[in-house]
Amino acid sequence: MTYLEALRTARVQSPQSYLYTTVARMHLGSVAAVCISILISSGRMTVKQLSSKAGIPVKTVKTTLVSLIQLRCVQYWREEGSGRVLYSFNEEGIWILLQSGEIINWIRCEYGEEEAEIIQNILEIGHIKVADYLTNFEDQKRHDREIILMRLYSDKWLRRLQPFNFNPLADIWEAKYEETIRSIPRTNTTSEIKRVTEAKEQTKRKIIDLFQSADDPNVVFTVKDGIKKLNPNITISFNLARFEKHLRSEALFHLAKYKVGTLTAKVYETALKLVEANSPDLNPQFLSISGWCADPEEVKSYKNSIENKLVDDRKITFGVRDVARALPEDLDLSCSILTHNFLKPTKRASDGANGAASKKVKLEDGESLDVFVENLEKNDSQSSSLILHHLKALCSGTNISFLHETSPSNFTIPYSALVDELKKHHYDLLIKITLGPNAFRVLRALKSLKLADEKALANAVLLKEKTLRNEIFNMVNLNIVEIQEVPRSADRAASKTFFLFRHKEQTAYNFLINSLTFGMAELLQGIVDFKDEHRILLAKCEREDVKGNEESLLLASELKTLKTLQEREMVSIARFSRLKALRQVFSA
């Protein structure tokens, strides 16, 4: 199978397959793209099966799979009886490749150049043993890198990698479940349903314990000369879930900025950063197991239980003082609107009045300075009071509760509820901007009515019948509105049938995710096609004698084509980033 054949197959199979195949082609080459396309379409396979289907030599396939496993794009599973090794696709590695530039830039801005260099090195090779990485440095430089690694691991940007991380989670579940169900004997007093339920619960506990063992502090850390360091024998990799939490925090900050204003949103951003590392994952990994949760309600309950446990353990709670300490120094809240609403103006004391209690502080040059302790305490209390009012506004200032107050002056962030509100907000804006205000009115009416016929909908939105039908037609084509047929007779005669309309959020979101994914793939494929079309010119520009001398060695037409290529690539990447950010919101 050639790359073009694999691309055509991926394009018609699913938007995700199209995107992943295109990304693999751009970053890893044609052979890797063909292997990934086949693994997505055919499921897990052996090396020989993959080689036969792809028409690629076994040796080349093995070499490619090693690289893909290293970069977490492929996982493997060894069967117990036959000993066969089966390979399957893992989308986590592709998403790391897609967001690697953004990840490095964020680490550079937040931490520094050396931290960004470490993350870049780990992203390039997938994972690395701590001892192997530190052998590249000597003495003080080595000590500095140990501190940086410890900091990045403590902030959860890095995670410990174990052998089971290379295995598909579904296969681990099946193996543990089979082991557990065999250990529970069949009895006359216990029903099969109860036996299976008990086996599932035990399997869940085993898998949770298995994954929690990766964070065992006795294994991960060592103490030398009173300094806590990472164990040099562990293997570390980048934690994609941590970056997804950062993206969620950014999205929530922008939503707060839109709803309550810039200054209050800045306070909220500080609060988000305080608990970001310990916040619940956007997509808990165990939910990918088919037997973990039975229905959507159970999934929702499971996510809420994770969040509630974090609140009970005080891992995602914070106080006013925590926010006050973490606020940026250049953020002046005294100019906010809340100042005049909640703080009384200070009375100007007369010159003859009794002054506030003062304290003598000795300076370096021997002179003393009167420090008015009472005034300092007043300023601190006023600052804390002002921050508290900003936090109160985030709790109940809008129709969205950005915070919940768990106890006086202590707050938590309701992530599950906020993610739902975030999706609704962005979806409503998309409908309003792309389809117009009339479609937005129809959508809001359907959300309110739940299920409505054309007449009830027309009365609710106050639109003409023809206009309403046009809007509904467009919205049905985009899976925003669903049609439900209601027959009035047993023979379901068309003349006696009427139709109801409804809006299902998850169905609409899934259609939007697929549309955004396909758009992302089309943009990347456009870049690839344009580069392939001018590959001779690009190869010429890569020559050592041409680099830096393009203007003197290239023709005017070639320079124009090169400029067009650069501009087109920049525009496509900018559009791609916007689509990716929007997809991230609805994928949570």
Swiss-Prot record:
Predominant localisation class: nucleus
UniProt-annotated stretches for the region Leucine-zipper: 516-537
UniProt GO cellular component terms: RNA polymerase III complex
Domain of life: Eukaryota
Disulfide-linked positions: none
Protein's GO biological process: termination of RNA polymerase III transcription; transcription initiation at RNA polymerase III promoter; tRNA transcription by RNA polymerase III
InterPro entries cross-referenced by the UniProt entry: POLR3C_WHD (IPR055207), RNA_pol_III_RPC82-rel_HTH (IPR013197), RNA_pol_III_Rpc82_C (IPR008806), RPC3 (IPR039748), WH-like_DNA-bd_sf (IPR036388), WH_DNA-bd_sf (IPR036390)
Location in the cell: Nucleus
Molecular function terms from GO: DNA-directed RNA polymerase activity; single-stranded DNA binding
Pfam families for this protein: HTH_9 (PF08221), POLR3C_WHD (PF22536), RNA_pol_Rpc82 (PF05645), RPC3_helical (PF20912)
Keyword terms of this UniProt record: DNA-directed RNA polymerase, Nucleus, Transcription, Zinc
Family, per entry: Belongs to the RNA polymerase beta chain family.
Function summary: DNA-dependent RNA polymerase catalyzes the transcription of DNA into RNA using the four ribonucleoside triphosphates as substrates. Specific core component of RNA polymerase III which synthesizes small RNAs, such as 5S rRNA and tRNAs.
Record text on subunit structure and interactions: Component of the RNA polymerase III (Pol III) complex consisting of 17 subunits.
Protein name (database record): DNA-directed RNA polymerase III subunit RPC3
